[in-house]
Amino acid sequence: MDENIQHVFLVGAKSLGAYGGYETFINKLTEYHQNDSRLKYHVACKANGDGCMDETKVGGVTGIIKDKDGNTVEFTYHNARCFKIKIPQKIGPVQAIYYDVAILSECCNYIKEYHISHPIVYIMACRIGPFMKLFYNKIHKLGGKVYLNPDGHEWMRAKWSKPIRKYWKASEQMMVKYCDIAICDSVNIEKYIHDCYDGKGIKGTDPKTIFIAYGAETRKSKLADDDPKLLGWYEDKGLTAKGYYLVVGRFVPENNYETMIREFMRSQSKRDFAIITNVNDKFLNKLEEKLHFRSDKRIKFVGTVYDQELLMKIRENAYGYFHGHEVGGTNPSLLEALGSTDLNLLLGVGFNREVAEDAALYWSKNDGSLAGLIDKSDKLNDEKITAMGEKAKRRIAEAYSWQFISDRYVEEFLEK
């Protein structure tokens, strides 16, 4: 392999078509670097199960390689080599651990087989701590380095039981210990890493960290207001421009769908609440049992939108955007909302305030907080909403543009 090319193996995302933070990040990183001959990305994707990669739904895929059974095992996207990892489906939460271990094993085998010089293995999330010393030593023996993106308190996520949370916390400590550098997407996350793990690195060292945020676009969608694709989508979903509040994100408890739906139902708003997500039936039914939201015709689960220009236009035309994430660092969905939607209503936790500052309105999980904010927001005049939008876009352009973020990664990856 050409020693002048920096090979970077990206570990931890499920696919390139999902709404998770890492999926969005990898999509944009490979897009912005696709014509940089100094970099070659290798992206792991799930072959099966929840959130798996379906390359037929993503435009621009080439070089598809299939196995003897006709299943895609490898393809090219944004000039990145994407490879699929199959996972046993009957091992429950252990799937996440199995997935990362299987990816790292495949990465090490590939690096060895193709004699890749000075590879970087960039691991997103802290799931495989007990295996990290083994892989750290293996990758170093192959002449590589281990980079980590600590995902922002995986152990705090509501979906996990107490024993699993305990495992994630211990795993996080080991992951931070056995990495060459931790790239933190939030100043709050970087501070947390040092507060918790200074003096706990190899031979009692402090972890080496840098801050590089996620990015977002500030341009307008290429679709016009009367584009047939947009109008057809609106007709199909029963929505109209500026006639809906919006949320886009993974359908998991810690994103506070329960609070947002309950509070919207309490509000007096005449607008709809459009929810773009990959619905999990178990969680959906649990919410219905608690909230009986199906009786409120304003609440609309509208499925997924893989067309990025259409999704951007849907964001632009939303009256307001809700963001209920309370675990994690800089969230791509929030950045995209600030870059596209004028009025943003955010859960007032540190991570969200760090990103949006005074370019958004904030709510708490207290009863009536969001409902009251929705009713106030419905009464805002156009001038106030436009001013909020301009402020939000300025914030993104100054600190979170994808061009700026991708340039920072080039500097880091190519630093010798």
PLM regions with names:
Residues 45-50, 216-217, 248, 271-288, ...:
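Glycosyltransferase donor-sugar binding loop
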Residues 5, 10-19, 31-93, 189, ...:
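N-terminal strand-loop element at the rim of the active site
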Residues 8-11, 229, 234-255, 261-268, ...:
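Conserved donor-binding/catalytic core segment of Leloir-type glycosyltransferases
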Residues 360-368, 375-382:
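Conserved acidic donor-binding segment of nucleotide-sugar-dependent glycosyltransferases
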Residues 164-182:
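Membrane-proximal helix-turn-helix segments that form the acceptor-binding/catalytic region
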Residues 177-208, 216-221, 409:
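A short, active-site helix/loop in glycosyltransferases that binds the activated sugar's phosphate group
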Residues 313-329, 342-343:
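Acidic donor-binding loop of glycosyltransferase active sites
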Residues 95-108, 118-142, 147-150, 329:
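An aromatic- and histidine-rich active-site surface loop
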